[in-house]
Amino acid sequence: MAARNHGEVVLEAKKSKLKPPPMFKVILLNDDFTPMDFVVTVLQTFFSMNREQATQIMLKVHMDGAGVCGVYPNDVASTKVEQVVAFARQHQHPLQCVMEEN
């Protein structure tokens, strides 16, 4: 923003107030048909987890009915949900993946 001060131009700094983007949890839901090994593969492939991390999340999904795979900005979370669901369908598994605001 510019202001005039006796014929001189004085620039005023305007502070930008950017907020971080809203974050979304990507959640796998349990079902009675998708094999545990497939869930581990999904977690390793789409969420870059090692086998131990993937197994822990898979067991949480199995025992509690759902497990958080990660927290991402909206567009990344949405893409991951679509990729997981498409991969599961491609392999004929009913695995569900959803996202919710963190």
Curated annotation (Swiss-Prot):
Record-level GO BP terms: protein catabolic process; proteolysis
Looking up Pfam families in the UniProt record yields:
ClpS
* InterPro entries for this protein: ClpS, ClpS_core, Ribosomal_bL12_C/ClpS-like
Coiled-coil regions listed: none
What is this protein's function per UniProt? Involved in the modulation of the specificity of the ClpAP-mediated ATP-dependent protein degradation.
- Report quaternary structure and partners: Binds to the N-terminal domain of the chaperone ClpA.
Into which family does the record put it? Belongs to the ClpS family.
Q: What is this protein called?
A: ATP-dependent Clp protease adapter protein ClpS
Native organism:
Nitrosospira multiformis (strain ATCC 25196 / NCIMB 11849 / C 71)
From the UniProt record, report the name of the gene that encodes this protein: clpS
